[in-house]
Amino acid sequence: MARSALLNVMVQAVFKAGKSLARDFGEVQNLQVSLKGPADYVSQADRKAERIIREELMKARPTYGFLGEEGEEIKGTDGAHRWIVDPLDGTTNFLHGIPHFAISVALERQGEIVGAVVFNPATDELYTAERGGGAFLNDRRLRVGARKALSDAVIGTGTPHLGRGNHGKYLVELRHVMGEVAGIRRMGSASLDLAYVAAGRFDGFWERDLAAWDMAAGLLLIREAGGWSTDAEGGGKPLEAGSIVCGNEHIAKALREVIQRPIPSK
């Protein structure tokens, strides 16, 4: 596959940060037996990865803005472009030695996502997409799953964790979805879960209370793999709403209808 100069910049940045995270992940696995625990070490690894990515991207395109999970937003001087970065999506998995985490980098141009990279350093799976150019896993072209019936579908999701609200609402949605689908998976890394939708591994996905860096790259991967996405309320703007429902068009629309069912009266 041929990549543009901008996509190559993104790929090289995530590869460099990925080498750092892979080394740190090996150390975290060794720290699992420590009573002190690896939490502080993981926080340092997260910040270090973002610093590497920011330096690489800003070196290549110094006029672009930068929005990352770990630091304050940098406003770009060109006013049109912005990098959107999650240096370690799946921190809890990383902390516990579970190899399901990713680096997510998206390029936004005048409000539209035009480039995407999601990379899992533990598996060397690199997901890339450019607007109008398709989505790829390493060098393999991606297509979303073809299943049309929820009863045949495996659906990914994310659960509200400690410190977040909406637990009750989520449990109602989960109960509704459980009654309609073949299976539900909660993997713990939204950007990688969205990449799984693009690859056809998940037939669909939904989650609320997400930040832009959780979704930006995954949204383009899904679109370029022939998928469809909206927010949980059906407004069509996941990044603004902070929620997402996605899959192929049949699955995503059916899934959104299910999660919109009213809360049953007691």
Curated annotation (Swiss-Prot):
- Where, in this chain's numbering, is Mg(2+) 1 bound? E69, D86, L88
Q: Which PROSITE patterns match?
A: IMP_1, IMP_2
GO biological-process terms attached to the record: inositol metabolic process; phosphatidylinositol phosphate biosynthetic process; signal transduction
Q: Where does substrate bind?
A: E69, L88, D89, G90, T91, R185, D214
- Could you tell me what reaction this enzyme catalyses? a myo-inositol phosphate + H2O = myo-inositol + phosphate
> Is Hydrolase tagged as a keyword?
yes
Output the CDD domains linked to this UniProt entry: IMPase (cd01639)
Name the chain's protein: Inositol-1-monophosphatase
Species per Swiss-Prot/TrEMBL record? Rhizobium meliloti (strain 1021) (Ensifer meliloti)
Cofactor or coenzyme needed = Mg(2+)
- Single GO molecular-function term? metal ion binding
Residues annotated to bind Mg(2+) 2: D86, D89, D214
Q: Keyword set for this entry?
A: Hydrolase, Magnesium, Metal-binding
Q: Which domain of life is it from?
A: Bacteria
Matching entries from InterPro entries are given as: IMPase (IPR033942), Inositol_monoP_metal-BS (IPR020583), Inositol_monophosphatase-like (IPR000760), Inositol_monophosphatase_CS (IPR020550), Inositol_monophosphatase_SuhB (IPR022337)
Q: What is its EC number?
A: 3.1.3.25
Broadest EC class?
hydrolase
Q: Is the Cytoplasm keyword given for this protein? A: no
Q: What family does the database annotate?
A: Belongs to the inositol monophosphatase superfamily.
